[in-house]
Design a protein with these regions (language model features):
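Phospho-regulatory, Ser/Thr- and acidic-rich intrinsically disordered linkers and terminal tails
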Residues: 1-207
Length: 207
């Protein structure tokens, strides 16, 4: 996982928390490296996925997920980011766990939605059955809500205490390319066209 030269604490905290969200990940500053050098370095070290975090004036505003070695690459706008450091009531939060999480992928029913869900799914190893960590990607009207929880069982199977861990954010998919992020000539698989003239709004990811 890489991010630009840091200009604000918000992007720093967010990237630190993403490192825990995605198991087995490493966080690096991009510095002056060009994208092609980063991708080639990842390939040579047999890294399976590259996540690039973009920022504007220190605030995270974009996420690129590139599957290696051949793609695809998904581009997302990043909205409504709330890090653990932004939450005042820390006592109400659960502790960050590094166990492999169970995934909930909700309402990715179209072809593009299934493709997006698969891109996200491959960022996470298979969890152990006893893992008490949950990560949710829930699609509503093409905005993907990310939530991170842990749970504890108390007594019967229906008695579950769910605690949000953070961070939380929304994703807006705007492009999927068949190749890797450094391949400008790669064919587009999906491009968001929000200003298309249609009588009825068609959701791209789900119902």
């Amino acid at each position: 996982m890489m991010h630009p030269v840091l200009t604000d604490w918000s992007i720093l905290f967010f990237c630190q928390e993403l490192k825990v969200v995605f198991p087995n990940s490493q966080r690096m500053n991009r510095g002056g490296q060009v994208i092609s050098e980063i991708v080639e370095s990842c390939r040579s070290h047999e890294i399976t996925d590259l996540i690039l975090v973009h920022e504007h004036r220190g605030q995270p505003d974009g996420l690129i997920v590139c599957h290696l070695p051949l793609g695809p690459t998904a581009y997302f706008g990043l909205l409504n980011v709330v890090t653990r450091h932004d939450i005042k009531d820390r006592k109400a939060m659960g502790k960050m766990s590094e166990a492999y999480p169970h995934l909930i992928l909700d309402n990715f029913t179209t072809k593009t939605g299934e493709r997006t869900a698969n891109i996200m799914k491959h960022l996470f190893p298979v969890p152990k059955p006893e893992s008490k960590r949950l990560i949710t990607f829930a699609n509503r009207d093409d905005y993907i809500s990310f939530r991170h929880h842990i749970y504890e069982k108390h007594g019967g199977p229906k008695s579950i205490d769910l605690k949000e861990v953070g961070p939380r954010f929304e994703l807006r998919l705007y492009q999927i390319k068949r190749g890797t992020v450094d391949q400008s000539e790669a064919q587009n698989e999906f491009v968001l066209r929000p200003y298309m003239n249609t009588a009825k709004k068609q959701n791209s990811l789900g119902v």
